Amino acid sequence: MTDAPGPPRKRRPRYAGTHPRRFEEKYKERDAARYPDEREKVIASGKTPAGSHVPVLVAEVLEALAPAPGEVAVDATLGYGGHASEILKRILPGGRLLALDVDPIELPKAAARLAQRAADLGDPEAVKTVKRNFAGLRKLLDEESLAHGADVILADLGVSSMQLDDPGRGFSWKHDVPLDLRMNPGRGQPAGSLLLRMKREEIEDFLRRLGDEPEAAGIAAALHATNEARRGSSPLHLQRNLPLPLLRTSDVTRAVELAYEGRTSRDASEAKRSSLQRTFQAIRILVNDELAALDAFLRDLPFCLAPGGRAAILTFHSGEDRRVKKAFKAGLEAGLYARVADEVVRATPEERGKNPRSSSAKLRWAVRASRSPSGVT
């Protein structure tokens, strides 16, 4: 007599080698329950674990801002909240932290982390988070009865690692998904829709202007050709006045690859990757109108600071840095700032090794004058 066969054993999914195709196989550190050691392995290799965020230039930011107990601080671009958490620790007891962000997906998570941090430090009422673009900071301070200004203001203009590593957000070429790149998915048009309506010259212009991209002409030509192919393959959409299918992240990747077609050297491969980063960054800046928001923030910044207040801004793009440098210099000459950074502050080699995303970060700071020049409000 033989035993009846049991149910067939369920085979576990095979890992696809050193170059897996599926996101969850390649970025196993996102699943700490199944792969508890992966996060530490990634950190030890000098990379940032997917789905997490390591704040950049923390020591340098704290040195520039010098937050002290009892002060009012503003994190104008909260993100994950790494910088805000360190600032909060230094303004307590008696301090107050106001934190802003436009991302409706990440803001509640960061708010919960900060609230817990404040409670652990003994003052659960010390933090307030607000869904607001930093361009409206001056108005927000009035609403919060802080018209006299804040003692400390930080703005970190980089995209957070959580946004980059979330496949559904369309921020990264790592995932073949509809091209979105909106900080606030409920506002404006996704990038894949906006680019479909742009002319080749318009695409080339913003890639040069917002991305400093040397291969802008070739990338723009390839993207425009993709747009034309979409129109040609979707006659019913056009006849019925329906929206065309959105461009995907893979369309942008393919456009960059076409711009480098025929170049196979190691240098060309590294240059292609840099172009890919700059192209996605330029599209993100365009879609979110980031430079206009930055200009508005810089214009109001001196009037958001209390006398002697300190501001620090982290940039990740030369166009952003030029604007900050110019605004700080103009404010110094107008007597609005008492001091500004003489040189840009960069991440140390040690930090760049541990956190590659810090490599492009630039920090500039300014100190508000004790009083406004006559006639300036």
List the predicted regions and their residue ranges.
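S-adenosyl-L-methionine-dependent methyltransferase catalytic core, i.e., the SAM/SAH-binding region
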Residues: 1-377
